[in-house]
Design a protein with these regions (language model features):
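Catalytic centers of hydrolytic enzymes
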Residues: 1-187
Length: 187
């Protein structure tokens, strides 16, 4: 985890180097399938081009198509919190919870789809990076920084012979070739 990429002891300094902002974790409860789709449309509009705007997912599988229309969020003041959706996106094709329940199928929100809870940082939950859908929803704070959550998570892995946390090679979530399929891009 050191910024050099070399193996070694994981320190709070390492996680602060990676996540230097004072973001706290928050839960947003009762997020409708329609809101989930709009939030993911924003994520799919920026793709994986960097900048931190592409959301990291857990608990669901998402399929997006690059050929769909990207959501457009206006930002007349240049403030990343002031955006409004001006063009509806059509890139999100399917969203399925890991228990198999569908939220979005073939680009349409599924009738009677369950509401979900979203956990994210205060920056994103408050609409940062032009996520206006998140900004309008009710949040419950944990009081834990995302840096602390990362530190605790890394230390939760089994220790290797040198006493360092190590991801088991059998954990498909971290496979460089396949991953666990949380996100799929279609042409």
């Amino acid at each position: 985890l050191p910024t050099t990429g070399a193996a070694g002891v994981i320190s709070r300094g390492n996680t602060f180097d990676l996540l230097p902002f004072d973001n706290r974790l928050v839960a947003i409860t009762n997020v409708s399938a329609a809101d989930v789709k709009e939030i993911l449309e924003r994520s799919c509009s920026v793709g994986t081009s960097g900048g931190g705007q592409f959301l990291q997912l857990a608990g669901m599988k998402v399929t997006c198509s690059r050929s769909g229309t990207a959501i457009v969020v206006s930002n007349p003041t240049g403030d990343s919190y002031a955006g409004n959706v001006t063009t509806v996106g059509t890139r999100v094709k399917d969203v399925t919870l890991l228990d198999g329940r569908a939220l979005v199928k073939d680009g349409a929100v599924v009738a009677n789809a369950p509401a979900v809870t979203v956990v994210t940082t205060t920056f994103t939950a408050d609409g940062g990076d032009n996520y206006p859908t998140l900004a309008k929803l009710v949040k419950v704070g944990f009081g834990v920084s995302y840096e602390q959550a990362l530190y605790d998570y890394l230390l939760s892995f089994p220790k290797n012979a040198a006493g360092l946390p190590e991801i088991p090679s059998s954990d498909v979530r971290y496979s460089k070739t396949t991953g666990d399929g949380r996100f799929t891009w279609l042409p």
